């Protein structure tokens, strides 16, 4: 049975639809609301939206206290089929923005902050021919204390990606690169 429709989807990852970790009749999915991507918490039993969050979710913590997000428009531009194409990417001219990267969303307060910036990730990539940096495949650990992600970059005139697996720890606030 259809319960909603959304334009915030892609053929690789859909709308990031997932079950709520505790509420059996609740699902989360990404959507578009005016000029921004959002996440919605939907109650299937009552057929209604319970909450709308300030950004689309890439992954949600096991205790449902926080979510992680990224710039889905940038992801779509740099890796078509993985992001969302409804809204334009405002970072087109920026190789590694300071104010873009992985975002932390406090689910209870519906507040968002940058956690890992593309500029910080790019700072230890020394190749002068770098064209663009981006992030994909964020995955929160089962205990919610860490998450892993791919930091990806391209070089000018080269269609191949450079990728490294990174792990962020909430315990020390550091990113470790696992190459």
Residue ranges of model-derived segments:
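Repeated scaffold domains used in trafficking and secretory/extracellular systems
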Residues: 7-19, 54-62, 136
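Beta-propeller domains
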Residues: 130-179
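Blade-loop segments of beta-propeller domains
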Residues: 1-32
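Short, conserved, GDST-rich strand-edge loop motifs in beta-rich repeat architectures
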Residues: 1, 70-99, 149-162
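Beta-propeller blade signature
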Residues: 1, 40-45, 96-108, 162-173
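Conserved loop/turn motif of beta-propeller repeat scaffolds
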Residues: 23-24, 63-64, 73, 144
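Surface-exposed loop and turn segments in beta-propeller and other repeat-based domains
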Residues: 2-10, 112-131
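Hydrophobic beta-strand positions that form the internal "hydrophobic ladder"
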Residues: 26-27, 67, 147
């Amino acid at each position: 049975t259809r319960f909603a429709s959304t334009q915030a989807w892609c053929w690789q990852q859909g709308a990031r639809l997932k079950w709520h970790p505790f509420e059996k009749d609740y699902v989360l999915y990404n959507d578009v609301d005016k000029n921004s991507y959002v996440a919605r918490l939907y109650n299937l039993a009552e057929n209604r939206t319970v909450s709308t969050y300030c950004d689309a979710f890439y992954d949600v913590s096991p205790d449902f206290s926080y979510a992680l997000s990224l710039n889905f428009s940038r992801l779509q531009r740099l890796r078509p089929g993985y992001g969302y194409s409804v809204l334009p990417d405002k970072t087109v001219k920026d190789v590694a923005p300071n104010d873009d990267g992985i975002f932390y969303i406090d689910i209870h307060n519906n507040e968002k902050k940058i956690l890992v910036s593309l500029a910080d990730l790019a700072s230890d990539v020394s190749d002068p021919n770098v064209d663009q940096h981006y992030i994909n495949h964020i995955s929160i650990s089962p205990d919610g204390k860490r998450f892993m992600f791919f930091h990806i970059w391209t070089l000018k005139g080269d269609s191949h990606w450079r990728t490294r697996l990174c792990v962020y720890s909430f315990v020390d606030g550091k990113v470790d690169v696992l190459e």
